[in-house]
Amino acid sequence: MISDIEFALSECNFQFAYKDLQKINLYIKRILLLNTRFNLISNSNSNFNSILNLHVIDSLLGLPTIKEANPSEILDVGSGAGFPGIILAIFDSSRKYYLLERSKKKSTFLKMIKLELDLENVKILEYEIEREKKKYEFITIRAFRSMNEYALVLKNLLKNEGLIMAYKGKFDRINLEVNQIKDLFSKIEVKSLSSKLSAERNLVLLYK
């Protein structure tokens, strides 16, 4: 299985250490083992290669943007099974990641994974986003919901000149969402990304 991870990362030109491969391998195995108990991902994608390509590789597509912005801390909203927060934290270990997940089941899983993978740069926040008072330079969210459902709430958690990075799907669905929230932000940028293994992905960057 580690060889599959190494191949996938190499195909997408991601830099990695062997310890990163070991952590990803264990992480995927834990999701497969505990998915039914914690309701982590769709059953239709609950096999090793689907998790690797649709979730792990997809999560990593945002890492270059994070490194370019170079924030000291990142808030990942609605972390669920840990995508993208856990994946980013594994490959970006010098940065602090706060994973906010309101579901007790999923946050329990995240706490288990944090300990098992020894992710000292991760902190799990188990509550509704409205309770969060800290301000962040950078926020990530990977959600199927329309951006107008969460844009204002997330903007209020940004420091001045902060940035929200929203993982979104097909480009033709994004324009309507962007038009609904364009007056909230000083600048909105759409980055079209692709890899040989993941589905179509666009990053929507919302600047305060």
Curated annotation (Swiss-Prot):
Compartment(s) of residence: Cytoplasm
Entry keyword RNA-binding: no
Alphabetical list of Gene3D superfamilies matching this protein: Vaccinia Virus protein VP39
InterPro entries on file: rRNA_ssu_MeTfrase_G, SAM-dependent_MTases_sf
GO cellular component terms attached to this protein's record: cytosol
Pfam family, one: GidB
GO MF annotations, alphabetized: rRNA (guanine-N7-)-methyltransferase activity
Entry keyword set: Cytoplasm, Methyltransferase, rRNA processing, S-adenosyl-L-methionine, Transferase
Source organism superkingdom: Bacteria
EC number: 2.1.1.-
Record-annotated disulphide pairs: none
Positions of S-adenosyl-L-methionine binding: 78, 83, 101-103, 129-130, 142
Record-stated family: Belongs to the methyltransferase superfamily. RNA methyltransferase RsmG family.
PANTHER family (UniProt xref): S-ADENOSYL-L-METHIONINE-DEPENDENT METHYLTRANSFERASES SUPERFAMILY PROTEIN
Role: Specifically methylates the N7 position of a guanine in 16S rRNA.
Protein name per Swiss-Prot or TrEMBL: Ribosomal RNA small subunit methyltransferase G
Originating organism: Borreliella afzelii (strain PKo)
Gene (name only): rsmG
